[in-house]
């Protein structure tokens, strides 16, 4: 097991709400805007790989693929399990159920 996989597992285990992200990724910017809009940005640990060298970004993405089954940016993990990407947030927002869904996972009271 690579050090990247071990560290990915540790980060996910340490943070009930986790997001693999990159500063250059428009979908990640959207997800972060949701956390800010709902004032839960302090609850979601965002691991931003955007400033790392390309080869290191790829190693992290491979590690998260192995750990949670997704290498997408953003990858949102709740209580150690893959929850979704920005697509999930868009779907819930379009249906008008975003806050309800985030309440179900304990992110909103």
Curated annotation (Swiss-Prot):
Induction: Strongly induced by the exposure to arsenic which causes glutathione depletion. Residues 5-109 form the Glutaredoxin domain. Keywords: Cytoplasm, Disulfide bond, Electron transport, Redox-active center, Transport. GO terms for cellular component: cytoplasm. GO terms for molecular function: glutathione-disulfide reductase (NADPH) activity. It holds the Pfam family Glutaredoxin. The keyword Cytoplasm applies. It comes from the Eukaryota. Disulfide bonds join 25-28. InterPro entries: Glutaredoxin (IPR002109), Thioredoxin-like_sf (IPR036249). It is found in: Cytoplasm. Signal peptide: none annotated. Its main location: cytoplasm. Monomer. Present with 573 molecules/cell in log phase SD medium. Glutathione-dependent oxidoreductase with lower activity compared to the other members of the glutaredoxin family. The disulfide bond functions as an electron carrier in the glutathione-dependent synthesis of deoxyribonucleotides by the enzyme ribonucleotide reductase. Belongs to the glutaredoxin family. This is Glutaredoxin-8. It comes from Saccharomyces cerevisiae (strain ATCC 204508 / S288c) (Baker's yeast).
């Amino acid at each position: 097991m690579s050090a990247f996989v071990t560290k990915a597992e540790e980060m996910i285990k340490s943070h009930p709400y986790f997001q693999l992200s990159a500063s250059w990724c428009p979908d990640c910017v959207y997800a972060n805007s949701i956390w800010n809009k709902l004032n839960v940005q302090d609850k979601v640990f965002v691991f931003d790989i955007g400033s790392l060298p390309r080869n290191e970004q790829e190693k992290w993405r491979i590690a998260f693929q192995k750990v949670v089954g997704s290498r997408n940016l953003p990858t949102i993990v709740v209580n150690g399990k893959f929850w979704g990407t920005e697509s999930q947030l868009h779907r819930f927002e379009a249906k008008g159920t975003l806050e309800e869904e985030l309440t179900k996972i304990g992110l909103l009271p």
